[in-house]
């Protein structure tokens, strides 16, 4: 598995599990909103009034409405520990 997906998959999965609303910005500037219904190596299925299959190579940014509970990537956890000390 590529190193990039070790961060990407748990993040997307937490957003999916908790049904957190997200804004997905595409590389062409279009903003899509909805909830992540499913995802795989190449696509994200975004559900709003309709379901849209969005290719990951077209995604620039994923902005959740809130941070998933109990989600703290290992690197971010180390950074937070330094801040709290």
Swiss-Prot record:
Domain Sm residues, every copy: 9-68
NCBIfam families assigned: Hfq, PRK00395.1
Subunit structure: Homohexamer.
Function recorded in the entry: RNA chaperone that binds small regulatory RNA (sRNAs) and mRNAs to facilitate mRNA translational regulation in response to envelope stress, environmental stress and changes in metabolite concentrations. Also binds with high specificity to tRNAs.
Similarity comment: Belongs to the Hfq family.
HAMAP family given in the database record: Hfq
Protein's name according to its UniProt entry: RNA-binding protein Hfq
Organism: Idiomarina loihiensis (strain ATCC BAA-735 / DSM 15497 / L2-TR)
